[in-house]
Amino acid sequence: MKIEEVKSTVRTQRIAAHSHVKGLGLDEAGSALQSAAGLVGQKAAREAAGIVVDLIKSKKMAGRALLLAGPPGTGKTAIALAIAQELGNKVPFCPMVGSEVFSNEIKKTEVLMENFRRSIGLRIRETKEVYEGEVTELTPVETENPMGGYGKTISNVVIGLKTAKGTKQLKLDPSIFDALQKEKVEVGDVIYIEANSGAVKRQGRSDTFATEFDLETEEYVPLPKGDVHKKKEVIQDVTLHDLDVANARPQGGQDVLSMVGQLMKPKKTEITDKLRMEINKVVNKYIDQGIAELVPGVLFIDEIHMLDLETFTYLHKSLESPIAPIVIFATNRGRCVIRGTTDIVSPHGIPLDLLDRLLIIRTLLYSTSDMEQIIKLRAQTEGLQLEDPAFARLSEIGTSSTLRYAVQLLTPAHQMCKVNGRTQITKDDIEDVHSLFLDAKRSSKHLSEKNNKFML
């Protein structure tokens, strides 16, 4: 008896800062639970985000923008990722950081537009007519060559297909005969033919012939069920950026010159507005015909204060364009100078005319009990065991410094606990790593005390 151990094909992913976030943690009425789906506290912000999710699902939020504003470490990025989790895989979600727009290769506005187009999905529904079955007959019909001479040409191909429900005889175009020869189709093979494109696919040999030979390399497949002629609906999800790239960079030939030409091209090519307008026309035509459906997704721009005045102006135009996604901004700044100017001070570093277009969600600082719950969640995600006094001490450290610093102490404390031969992290382990690794406040205090010892 042979027993094989099956290895999992699921990709192992690193435990990141927001691995524990699984959703917004709302009940059926849309009210936030104290601790659910990886989020703790921030009830008002989560309830507001829940309303936004409902609007996105009902397609009533496209072309509008949202701002998550609050101090550092209050869960702005976590709420944005929770929105993405609630929307699911079918709605495009494109995260980026404000500083990503600055590139030596392409313009700032081009980077923004690329990400805008990445956030807009297109769901294309295509009905394919398929003939599927076991080949019972394959007869090419020859005629005299119309060009004269002694040669003969194939005028059509007669093919018989059988399924569990019945049989059908088809008269096919001579071009399909070449495809049949390429696939090496014989009587007894199970094939399917696409009616629209004429594509032929050999699925394998019918399992009724399985006992024909002792040594056989064939793959045997069962006789197809249902009718010979079937209709299949194929749904394809693409983004507008995928269409832009496919049309901006058509594939070259296979010869050496074209391959060298592709290597010589710059890394990034700007997609022209003219091309985008042409693609929009085709997309609109598909939508009018009912072939395709537009799926407005979410563009999440973190650290929005890193954008400058030119990009903010471009955002006005992009948000008011007919095809626009839902844009979520996040910032941890109060009143500060707008980047790209010298003296214009504005709330969150965003111009007032753009702020006027935004719905603002505020995030508040966590209480000590909330911090303790978050640290427990993180410890559970990372598979660490802590004693209750250790959790209490970490939440105190988080309150006096930042939540991020308290969470970052977990892994070094676990290492310290392993060195001491224990399985549970104690309060002493936390104190040890707290004294070894400084937080920003203690480091700046140390810097101000010993300022004359450092180089200017």
Curated annotation (Swiss-Prot):
Look up the domain of life of the source.
Eukaryota
Its Enzyme Commission number(s) read: 3.6.4.12
Under catalytic activity, the entry for this protein gives: ATP + H2O = ADP + phosphate + H(+)
Q: Per its UniProt record, what Pfam families does this chain match? A: TIP49, TIP49_C
Name the InterPro entries for this protein: AAA+_ATPase, P-loop_NTPase, RuvB-like, RuvB-like_C, RuvBL1/2_DNA/RNA_bd_dom, TIP49_P-loop
Subcellular localization is given as: Nucleus
Q: What general EC class does the enzyme of this chain belong to?
A: hydrolase
One term of GO molecular function: transcription coactivator activity
Q: Which Gene3D superfamilies match?
A: 1.10.8.60, P-loop containing nucleotide triphosphate hydrolases (3.40.50.300), RuvB-like helicase, domain II (2.40.50.360)
Q: Which amino acid positions bind ATP, per UniProt? A: G70, P71, P72, G73, T74, G75, K76, T77
This protein's UniProt keywords: Activator, ATP-binding, Cell cycle, Cell division, Chromatin regulator, DNA damage, DNA recombination, DNA repair, Helicase, Hydrolase, Nucleotide-binding, Nucleus, Transcription, Transcription regulation
Q: Which GO terms describe its biological process?
A: cell division; chromatin organization; DNA recombination; DNA repair; positive regulation of canonical Wnt signaling pathway; regulation of cell population proliferation
What cellular component GO annotations does this protein have? nucleus
Function statement:
Acts as a transcriptional coactivator in Wg signaling caused by altered arm signaling. Pont and rept interfere antagonistically with nuclear arm signaling function, and are required to enhance or reduce arm activity, respectively. Also an essential cofactor for the normal function of Myc; required for cellular proliferation and growth.
The family this protein is said to belong to: Belongs to the RuvB family.
List the PANTHER family hit by this protein, alphabetically. Answer: RUVB-RELATED REPTIN AND PONTIN (PTHR11093)
State the oligomer form and interacting partners.
Forms homohexameric rings. May form a dodecamer with rept made of two stacked hexameric rings. Component of the chromatin remodeling Ino80 complex.
Q: What is this protein called?
A: RuvB-like helicase 1
Species annotation: Drosophila pseudoobscura pseudoobscura (Fruit fly)
The gene it comes from is pont
